[in-house]
């Protein structure tokens, strides 16, 4: 959102980053149009945002610290994994491939495919069903406050991990999540 608004000569408001963090692309475009009174149509906003996001995922996106090691260990333990993202599927696949972790996941679920954002539990429920587990037996790693709240309310075990975009929500994340970590391998250190 911030890069898109900047491309229009607009400054992103503080609350915009959190508002966009756990919603579908369509929901985010509608939010930007309404909040910033944009003349662009929702499909035009989506197209422009996808171009910006595509460049980021293809050329810039890096894994959070400790993710690769944690995924490798989980796979060695025979734990099945899936991705539940509010991002675009093709871009998520590209970023996972570029970072060498795509093979750890059995499937990628997107809010767009599910038809709802992470403010509803459907994406987590679909992933759990695919994995053959019940919510209370399924760990959800989250870095977004609203998404963590949704997963927790739906009965999932929620582990929080730091993300720069959600730094202002860390105290709330620590309250909501079963455990909260600055990096994923901090969790791994306690489970090896």
Where in this protein do the model-derived segments appear?
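N-terminal helical cap/lid subdomain that shapes the substrate entry/recognition surface
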Residues: 1-77
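Short, contiguous strand/loop micro-motifs
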Residues: 15-16, 57-58, 79, 83, ...
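Residue-level detector of anion-binding/catalytic polar loops
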Residues: 11, 80, 157
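Short, flexible loop segments at the rims of nucleotide/cofactor-binding pockets, characterized by
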Residues: 57-62, 86, 158-160
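Structural motif
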Residues: 19, 84-86, 141
């Amino acid at each position: 959102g911030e890069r898109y608004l900047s491309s229009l000569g607009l400054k992103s408001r503080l609350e915009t980053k959190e508002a966009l963090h756990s919603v579908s692309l369509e929901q985010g475009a509608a939010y930007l149009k309404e909040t910033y009174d944009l003349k662009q149509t929702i499909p035009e906003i989506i197209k422009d945002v996808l171009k910006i996001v595509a460049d980021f995922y293809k050329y810039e996106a890096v894994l959070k610290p400790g993710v690769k090691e944690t995924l490798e260990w989980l796979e060695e333990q025979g734990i099945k994994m899936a991705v539940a993202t509010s991002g675009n599927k093709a871009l998520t696949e590209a970023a996972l491939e570029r970072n060498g972790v795509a093979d750890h996941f059995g499937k990628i679920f997107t809010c767009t495919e599910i038809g709802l954002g992470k403010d509803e539990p459907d994406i987590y429920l679909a992933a759990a069903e695919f994995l053959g587990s019940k919510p209370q037996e399924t760990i959800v790693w989250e870095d977004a406050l609203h998404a963590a709240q949704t997963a927790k309310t739906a009965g999932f075990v929620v582990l929080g991990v730091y993300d720069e975009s959600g730094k202002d929500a860390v105290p709330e994340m620590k309250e909501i999540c079963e455990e909260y970590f600055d990096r994923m391998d901090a969790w791994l250190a306690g489970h090896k």
